[in-house]
Structures are given as structure tokens and as C-alpha cells.
């Protein structure tokens, strides 16, 4: 599907260049086993979309805390032959019986998050399998069943628990007495599995084999659908109301990409209900008047300016962005150049402002801002095939291990907690409130960058909940403004704004400049702002890949002779297994 969003702007700035040149193929993800699955598919002659699909399925097995077939995601795809940029929205939907007060307590106040998070009532109808099916129909090269083989192998034969999974299992252990199915897979001898243990998941292997053999409908109808509905409605904690009809009715949505110029580039991403592209592009547009290249990455002023632009854009995000099937979302107004200039003029280069109101973009109806929350159970992966096609996808089950409910060996999401809990503010309906069939607002931001000649040169995304937007923005600035190598740009310090202060990633060079940042007139605090960025970049005519140094991710290349080569990150095999096998 051709990109037609902001079409006048897009055509004025960029003519996308088709290319048929062959080069090394690249896959990157947050887990080496998933990266290897993508590279395996590329080595078999698979397309970028095929490789992304294999990575998503493998991540269901080896990174169950972050994503999987029980969740949803967003895919941005670039077809190098005809220059088409397409996106698929696989965001979860609220059940047909969902109501705006779903997460309101009996006292009329929003529930505490921990009460809303766990159990069947927070589960949205999963979208990932439909997304993958649409992508495979449009751009797949290998057979559907072939793409499941690496994940089936990992689930059936077992995989080694890494430090990240060990840590996440320890973090939720106190909740799992209520979640028998989760314990049966991930606990050994009555305790959470440790790094070096081997986990086998035969139930998930069976589920994957069924979908591989019967196709995507096997997930949304029949035995697997029955398992999902049963797990949701009989959950010991907060049972939900998802039905077989909800699953059968689910459809992924092909949308127009959202694109805008930044300096000599054009940057594109997902339309709402993803807030990623709109907010990233607002931030970049707002700081474009400032010469970040001259200031450099080591000047506190650069980060002051980026932080102020972030606050302006997030104020608009909370007021205007939601599912466009339910709410008029003024994307073009939010990215209008005159409006961006008006917002940018509010920034004082020498003095921070603690709070910015939402603006009044062209074409927007007055809207009440309301804060929505997002947790960090998310992952990103990307692939470029030998023909230069790009598949760039962010996938999530929302919180760590989703809602903790397991069906068919996989975790279900708690995506409905991405809706704003309080449906009204000051007597007016909130844009991102719960409604039947609605898709909650997301910060997932799979992003593709084109150069001045219209050539795709960079694709990236990240995990991190509401911070995803800043992780992606920071990396873009690192590459496009500071001129850093991709890995170094990903490794730049993360910042965010929360609890009335500018938060700076602890144990980074920027954390040593807190006094300099505070001199601009706002509180600054160190914080744990870890990220999981994965990206591919065209450098001197050759695609490279990189994974966040904070993660256990990797990137692999496949050459013209279909030989695999690790180009970033650690070993593919992971830690040697201990004697404990589950």
C-alpha cells in the first residue's frame, strides 16, 4: 500500500527511490536466538517480512516477558523494488462488552495499576498473528509454515534462560501463586528458573505447529481461540469478558504512514493509535530551529533543548492522540509547519519551563488532556533482505509477562491498561478512554528514514513504554545531527520527564552534568531509563545492524553465499545450560 498520509508534504520533499541492488541481508532483535531465527530465514532466501515474522515467533518463546503471539504490534515495511512504504496496525482491541469505566473502582476513582494489570479483564484481542498473515500475503517469499520452524524448535527442544529473563521472573514471583499455568512453565522445583536453566514449552510448540499447519484462522477460531477465551474468563484474578466472537472479528489494519521532513531527511512511521511517529516528528520539528550539530552531544544545552521539545510534544500527545476510528485525531495539524514553529517559539534556550499546556493545532477540536500509562513489556526487531526490502516491527504484550495469564503456552497481553483509566476529565470525555472495539493509544515507534535523494537509509525502534518515543528520537538525533555511528547513537544517554523533573539515565556521562542541566531552571534527577533499541542502517552502500548495548540483543548479516555472520552483540548460543531442565 502506498504512503498517502500528508501526501502533499511527502511528495514535495521526497521521491522514494526504488532499488534492485543486492547486498548483505541483516536481522537484528533484542535476543540472539530470535536474531538467529531471522538470519536463518534470510539465508533460505526469505524476504525481510519473512525474517521479521520468524523473529516475532521466536521472541514469543525466548523473550516471553516482552512480546508474543498473545499481543499486538505495528509494522512499517519498505518495498525497495517499487518504492512503496506500507504500515500494518496489529494493535489489540477492546472486547465488545468493554465500557469506559472498566478501570474505575467502586469509590469512583481509577484503580491502582497493580489491580488493573493482572488477570483476564486487562486482555485485549491479540493482533500479531493477523498482522503477520497480512505481511506474509503482501511480501512473503517462503511458505507460511517454514517461518514457524525456528520458534517451534526453540519451544520444543528448549532454550537457555538468560539473565534478563531470570530478573523478570524474580520480579513477578510474588504474584504468581495465582497463575498456575505460568508457574508450570517457568518455575523449576517450586522456584523461578535461573540463568542457565533450560525451559521447554511443549504447549507453545503445539500451538505454533497448529497455526503453521492450518494458517492464521487457527488462532482466531477453533481450539486455540477456545483456550484464550477460557483463560481470560476463568482467571483466578479479575476474570475478563473476551468472547469467541471478539477473536473471530479481529482484523489488522493497513494504514497510511505518517511522514514529515527533518533537516535534509524525511522520517516516516505509524499513524495513530500509535503516537510514536506523530510525537517523534513533533519533537524533531520543534528542535529543528536549533543547531544541535554545533552544540554537540556533550553540551548540556543540547539535552535541555531536547527535553523542552519533548515536554511540548507529550502535552499534545496526551490531549489529542487516540484511535482514529473513534476520535478525530489532528495529525496533519499537529505536524503543520506553522504550528510547529509556534510551539518551538515557546522554548527559551537558556531557561527551562516545568510545564507546557497542550496547543491548538489547525483542525483540532478542543480536547481535555489526560495522562495514560504504558509499561515496558515490549520489543523491537528489524530485517533487511538482499533486495533492500525493510521490515521494521515493534511488538508488545504491554507489562512484563502481560497480564500473567497463559493460554496455549503463551502469555496474554494487558493492553487495555494502555487506555486512560478515568473516562472523563472536567466533565469532558477523554480521547483515549476505553470503548468497545477500540485500540488503545501506544508509544510504539517503528521508524524509517529517507535521505535527500529518497533512499531508505535507517530503520529503528525500541522497547520502553512511553519512553520509546524518546529512545527513538535520541537515536535519530545521534545519527542525523551528531553524526555518530549507529551503535554509539543508540548508546547515547536516555532522558525523560516525570514527576516534575527531567530524568537522566544514571551511570552515563550526562548524569555527570546534572548540575549543568539544573542550571537551566528545573529539577533534574538520575533514573533507571534503560532501553532496547534495535536498528539497521545503510552505510556506504551496505546495510549494517546494531542492538542496544544495554540489552542482550544482536545483529547478524547474511552474505551473497547465504553465510551467516554475527555483526553486533554476543554469542548466539547463549549461556551453557545447567543440569536443570524444565
Walk through the language-model features, giving the residues of each.
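Internal maturation/activation junctions in enzymes
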Residues: 289-396, 523, 548
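Short beta-strand scaffold segments in enzyme catalytic cores
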Residues: 67, 72-79, 379-383, 446-448, ...
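Active-site rim segments in enzyme catalytic domains, especially the processed small/beta chain
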Residues: 61-65, 72-78, 82-87, 238-243, ...
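Extended C-terminal subregions enriched in glycine
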Residues: 437-439, 472, 481-528
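Bacterial N-terminal signal peptides
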Residues: 7-17
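Short, small/polar residue-rich loop motifs at catalytic or cofactor-binding pockets
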Residues: 254, 375-378, 442-444
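Noncatalytic scaffold domains of N-terminal-nucleophile
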Residues: 22-36, 40, 46-49, 53-214, ...
